[in-house]
């Protein structure tokens, strides 16, 4: 049994340090790692909610997008001229996703949130965890780590244990756009409010470019 919780009390949680390799995007693109990550996501989506009690959060990416847009408008972002267009694209994406099944998702599947300790993978940084569509975690994993079309098809087919339907693929592509839009807007907000010594302007540029590329595939 893996026990990483060292202590907990109301408002406090102490975890043991995990020795291991923090994965890179290139690592995630290796089939050997994808074959470990997929069952991890299955367990997360299927089992975590069964262990929880009390109030639970929901992470609906389109609400998050609207909230970030509102913050950027209120705080006079340097990108204010782009916000109406991004808001409209968010509406288009939400309509494209349509009805969803709810699972308990991680919702922040950056490569740096996976640690390989030599015997298993750990998924860390659960700040955004909450109920969401399973398509968001799958799309988030794909868009954050540059999976190929073949890898995306493998991921969807093996997650749902069925051939990939046009509807599933369309929702997945919309969620990839939404994932990149959320990351872009988060970076824009961080430009204004973060105290970290990090080039958020460049990070915004990189993510906006990736979003534009994905949008052109979603809505050519």
Feature-to-residue mapping (PLM):
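A general structural signal marking secondary-structure boundaries and capping sites
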Residues: 41-52, 97, 145, 163, ...
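ATP/Mg2+ or Mg2+-diphosphate-binding catalytic cores
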Residues: 71-74, 78-81, 185-220
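All-alpha amphipathic helical-bundle segments outside canonical DNA-binding/catalytic cores
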Residues: 56-59, 165-176
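Active-site acidic catalytic loop and adjacent metal/ATP-binding pocket
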Residues: 5, 91-136
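N-terminal alpha-helical segment
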Residues: 64-65, 86, 134, 180
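Short amphipathic alpha-helical segments and their helix-coil junctions
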Residues: 118, 153-171, 207, 211-218
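Active-site activation/catalytic loop segments of kinase-like enzymes and analogous catalytic loops
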Residues: 135-164, 177-195, 210
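ATP-binding pocket architecture of kinase catalytic cores
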Residues: 3-60, 64-82, 99
